[in-house]
């Protein structure tokens, strides 16, 4: 049976030899020639299993990783010149070498592997995503108004840190955090009240469902008229967007405990609040954290979209809308990068807290086995 590692090995052998042959017809750069020859030799060794099995270091994942990253570095340096077939073949070979290194690493039993799996592989994947973004946009000469390369975005990002930080403060630190806290906490309180009172369940759930179906582009202008052009109106939009997901997930979590567990507490004459804090809330924690993680991204999206409908001359949404009109796409992508980093950090922080709080829960233990 052919596995993924075998497919990668044979693909690298073929592409490496093609890269080795094509370099003599196109490139004059010694670094590119060296990379192509090295990858071509590795391809020859992979075709010849006797050599490949006898030389042990050829099967080491660190060698494949070093080859891939070195080739990527040389390609980035050469990318501004004429981008021929050799660089395309070399780019694909470098990526496959990195993939093969990950496959080799996953086959090893190591104490550091969980750490590498959690951080190293996502970082490596992100690196190659940015690498091919750069290669495709520059190599195919795509206009920057359509898609700027990551290098151009990085330069704009570093030269506009003061503007980006001011926009981050306005959108995230004020609108998102305030709306997120109010929306999630109020939804949690209402979920407990609805769980205790059947009348509220029948009355509030349909209303919450109706509000959640309202389009954000319809809510945002109304909130601006009610609360003004500053961050308060954007926080109100975030409250509306985060309320219903938190409410539904909390209610589902409160009902996730089994009937046998509740009957056991009833036999000890436990009150409603004792059952809630001793059994039902701990059992609901995975559901609550799911809602918190979902809302961490919804809140940011809601605040940014709300800023399109009226805001002071600061904010991520305001900056995106104005810079698009000026065709400054590098600044638009820099703002998108800020939003992506803020959302990812928020989601990651909540995931870490969830791991600490729900480490005892069966769902967490099953997920990690």
Write out the residue ranges for each language-model feature.
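C-terminal transmembrane helix and the adjacent membrane-cytosol boundary/short C-terminal tail
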Residues: 42-52, 198, 255, 290, ...
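Periplasmic/extracellular loop-to-transmembrane helix junction in inner-membrane transport proteins
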Residues: 24-30, 78-83, 138-182
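Transmembrane-helix boundary motif in ABC transporter permease subunits
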Residues: 107, 178-208
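Short cytoplasmic-facing helical segments at TM-TM junctions of multi-pass membrane proteins
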Residues: 203, 249-288, 317-320
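Transmembrane alpha-helices
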Residues: 236-240, 274-306
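Generic hydrophobic transmembrane alpha-helix motif, especially the helices
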Residues: 208-245, 252-253
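Membrane-topology segments of multi-pass transport proteins
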Residues: 1-118
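Glycine-rich helix-loop "coupling/hinge" segments at transmembrane-helix boundaries
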Residues: 225, 253-254, 301-338, 364-368
